[in-house]
């Protein structure tokens, strides 16, 4: 009996000890390193370069992935799923953004633009159902078709119709002469089959579908202080049987909704700023939304 109790104690201590910090630096990191320190110390010690590698290094039990803000956007999709990315009520798995930008855009500078009519050009992007167009770092002004035809576009305006991006440059210029981008990656952060997760202090933009998508079976998960804007469909999407809290977050300029729910999900929405100028602040295609602020997670 004494050995059994001792074994349980050792197991408890081991499960606590395995939780660790993994650092990511997309400028100075290297995926051959351990990720255990924020700066390089020799060939093996130092931050990794990608969030994908950091997730592969996770072992469950409440690891923390800490992004170093290098000033350069992180250009990757993040998939948080399964036991290795789950924590406990006392020690959640964390993705700490430190104000970093997760960017899903691709340049249109060398895209195969074709002349449509007048001063309007068009191009067919990889993802055609939802899109955004950016002039440099700023979303371009979008127009919508009301009759199935390309609307009248003023210079530097665009629309999405029948799988094409239509864009009108300024007189005497071609689309290739602009610093144009569109959505080139599907979803910024996908959560699936995880529990006890905290995602904080990130900017997510330029993804074809959603900035953050809690797809299914996501439990006891908090999204805190995340700005998810200018994505093709929505800033935040909660679906399936997920239970998620979104707290002090922001969303603007998304294509179909700032926040959307579906399935049998329950979303707790605490504070935040969800600008309805481009699309409704909340679209419910199923699920339930509560706005109370309970003491527990």
Model-derived regions: residue spans:
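All-beta strand scaffolds that present successive hydrophobic residues in beta-strands
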Residues: 94-97, 197-200, 218-225, 244-249, ...
